[in-house]
């Protein structure tokens, strides 16, 4: 099965807990590798009363399916769940950069990112608008579109992480056209939808009035 890289997100948030709780289901369809401190995952698993057998991931392909593989990045400061702090902002970005790099090199087939506190990272002295913009920069991709998707519905956003007052000026004919082209191409190429049916919603609730 394909290997997927998973960054847990905010160390003091629910991300590590979600990783641990979702591990068994994830392992049915893929081979997950979690990026972070093994001690953090072990501590959180104990607090959840969930048994996991942690193994350190070292780049191998023949992973044992029921083992909890961690690409190890030690973090020596104390983490208290529910109390986020900017002291680990650099650490979060380091993990994201490494996970992104290994995906771009095809060592992994996908990257899953846990919930992250953008304000916390910015308070740590790092400019961070969101995962979408971060991944675009790391992959040298000029134009990207964020999509929320499940098997029944896919919703793409024309703008992301922008103050509402700035949005009207960003909704231009060229920008919407670029978004539609990206969505159309990826629905056909990555989702194997031969003739995508794309609906465009207006910013103004009366945009459809005659």
Give residue spans per PLM region.
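Contiguous, glycine/small-aliphatic-enriched amphipathic segments in soluble metabolic enzymes
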Residues: 1-131, 174-210
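Structural signal for conserved beta-strand scaffold positions within catalytic alpha/beta enzyme cores
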Residues: 56, 70-72, 146-149, 157
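Short alpha-helical interface patches
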Residues: 60-62, 138, 167, 171
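Glycine/threonine-rich beta-strand-loop-alpha-helix active-site module
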Residues: 123-145
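Short beta-strand/turn micro-motifs at beta-sheet edges
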Residues: 145-146, 188
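Ligand-binding beta-strand-loop-alpha-helix segment within the catalytic cores
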Residues: 148-179
